[in-house]
Amino acid sequence: MSDSVIYKKIRETVQSNLPGSRVLLFGSRARGEEDRFSDYDLLVITPQTFTSSEKIYWSTRIDRALIDAIKIPVDLLINSEEEIRQKQELPGHIIRTAIREGIIL
């Protein structure tokens, strides 16, 4: 399966579960440093803020759907636009890294 097909499936899966969300690919695949064992590191940016338990629910649901669709594991972070604004300025925070190196899908 080509990258463009995989990216489309990721976008569609996230959008069908969390409409209005944006998806960033970051990590080794965004940097072009992946190997055959690399997962997909994804930051899902939502318009609304979710509780921790809601994030777990949505992460699990989307993760399962993506494993079924692309047969490759994903590492999924879900944060609201407000949470992104707060976290992206924190040195060493994974959100800062994801925003800096992320590719919009």
Model-predicted segments: where are they?
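Short beta-strand->loop micro-motif that forms the acidic, two-metal-ion catalytic signature
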Residues: 41-45
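Catalytic core of pol beta-like nucleotidyltransferases
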Residues: 1-22, 30-36, 47-105
